[in-house]
Amino acid sequence: MTFRPLHDRVLVKRVEEESTTKGGIIIPDTAKEKPQEGEVVAIGGGAIKEDGSVRPLDVKAGDRILFGKWSGTEVTVDGVELLIMKESDILGVMA
């Protein structure tokens, strides 16, 4: 199944953090926080402005992004956990 977000929404796959620290300590799953970094999988057609015109999004599929801790709605598509969020929830694009 394919999924295409609408308007100014973005579909994001979280980037998993390392399970071992630099010092070699293994972090159990129960102690891990969900990462706030992800990769854009798909984007909507753009934000609709007040005059009815469409503003294209600043991000594109494949961009690596940072987002807020409570951003987005979790969904599962084809067994893969993803997030749907508005472009305004994205804090920035990593270079």
UniProtKB/Swiss-Prot annotation:
The keyword Cytoplasm applies. It holds the Pfam family Cpn10. It is found in: Cytoplasm. Gene3D superfamilies: GroES chaperonin (2.30.33.40). SMART domains: Cpn10. Keywords: Chaperone, Cytoplasm. InterPro entries: Chaperonin_GroES (IPR020818), Chaperonin_GroES_sf (IPR037124), Chaprnonin_Cpn10_CS (IPR018369), GroES-like_sf (IPR011032). GO terms for biological process: chaperone cofactor-dependent protein refolding. One of its GO terms (cellular component) is cytoplasm. Heptamer of 7 subunits arranged in a ring. Interacts with the chaperonin GroEL. NCBIfam families: PRK00364.1-2, PRK00364.1-5, PRK00364.2-2, PRK00364.2-4. Belongs to the GroES chaperonin family. Together with the chaperonin GroEL, plays an essential role in assisting protein folding. The GroEL-GroES system forms a nano-cage that allows encapsulation of the non-native substrate proteins and provides a physical environment optimized to promote and accelerate protein folding. GroES binds to the apical surface of the GroEL ring, thereby capping the opening of the GroEL channel. This is Co-chaperonin GroES. It comes from Maricaulis maris (strain MCS10).
